[in-house]
Structures are given as C-alpha cells and as structure tokens.
A protein has these predicted regions:
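Switch/connector loops and helix/strand junctions flanking conserved nucleotide-binding motifs
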Residues: 12, 89-96, 143-147
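Conserved substrate/cofactor phosphate-moiety recognition/catalytic segment
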Residues: 1-53
C-alpha cells in the first residue's frame, strides 16, 4: 500500500530544486511547492481510489476536504480506516513543531497550529463515523520511551467500549460517537 505525505512530497520538490530541504529554502517557495504537493497527493489518492487500490495519507484533518474521497471509497465498497494521533494542548503541538523544525522539518506559525488543533479534534467524529475501523491515540507524553496511549477505538463508526478519559475537548468529541455495546440494548 502506498502512503502519501504532502510534507514529504514538498521536501522532495525542494531537494529537486537544489535545496537541502525546508531548512535552507525560502518560505514563499515552500508554500508554493506545498500547494503543488497537496494537489499531487489529491490526484494520487483519486487515482488509487478509482483503481480500487489501497492508499494511505497523512493529514492534520483540520478541514473536511477528504470527506468526498472517503465517501467515494465507501460507495465503491471499500474500507476507510483512521488513525488519529493528538496531543492534549495546542501549546504542546507548537512545542512539537519547534522540535520538528530543529530536526530539519518545516515550520508552522503558532496561530495556524492553534487553529488546526481545534479544527482537527472537531473533525474527528465526522471521519470516525465513516471509518470501518478507527483508533485514537494521545501522544502528549514527551518521554520517547513511552508510546502514544490508545484512548479510543471503534468499528463501523461506533466506539468499542467507553474511551479512556484524556482531555476535555477530545473527551467531548468522542462522546458524540455511539458506544457498543449500547447501554440502551
């Protein structure tokens, strides 16, 4: 299965233009190439779906732009699976971006990180309800030897058992999903 990451595609494009990656390339060029990469990834996803091929994509999930592709996969009888990894505050997300940037990854302005953090978590139920299977991990622990904590999992858009309490916004969004077995049964 092919795995697509717009950030990786952008970095490859920068290297092809003679840069070492994000650390020595102009921000304006990075933005231009990121939009090209995002369009390329969209085309690759669309092509894979049209051919009924398995494909994965990395996304912040801060918009619902992939909903139409997910719906197309389902309409074709395919499976959409979601692995959602989150940290417990937008401030921690900002700290992680600073670390990524120091390790030659790309930077993101703090205001965009804050905005995307909230939008991403709010989009979770919408995508989870369409998933054949989904897993939600809290990656807030900063100790590298500690893996992310699985706080929720589901099948066919339904939580399998109650989620492990994490942080308020995530707990609230997960509460929007049905839980199996239902206490109403």
């Amino acid at each position: 299965m092919e795995f697509l990451n717009p950030d990786d595609v952008t970095k490859q494009k920068l290297i092809a233009q003679g840069y070492r990656g994000f650390q020595d390339s102009p921000l304006k060029l990075q933005r231009t190439l990121f939009f090209e990469a995002a369009n390329f990834v969209w085309e690759q996803l669309s092509t894979a779906i049209a051919k009924n091929e398995g494909v994965g994509v990395e996304t912040v999930l801060s918009t619902d732009k992939y909903l139409s592709l997910v719906e197309e996969v389902r309409a074709r009888g395919g499976y959409f699976m979601l692995i959602f990894i989150v940290v417990n505050t937008p401030e921690l997300a900002c700290e992680r971006v600073v670390i990524r940037t120091a390790q030659k990854g790309h930077s993101v302005p703090p205001d965009k990180i804050h905005d995307r953090w909230y939008k991403s978590i709010r989009n979770l139920p919408k995508f989870a309800q369409l998933a054949k299977a989904f897993w939600v991990f809290d990656n807030s622990d900063s100790q590298p030897e500690n893996p992310p904590v699985l706080v929720a999992r589901g099948v066919d858009g339904v939580l399998v058992g109650p989620p492990i309490p994490s942080f308020a916004l995530l707990d609230h969004q997960l509460a929007l999903l049905p839980v199996w077995p239902s206490s109403e049964a």
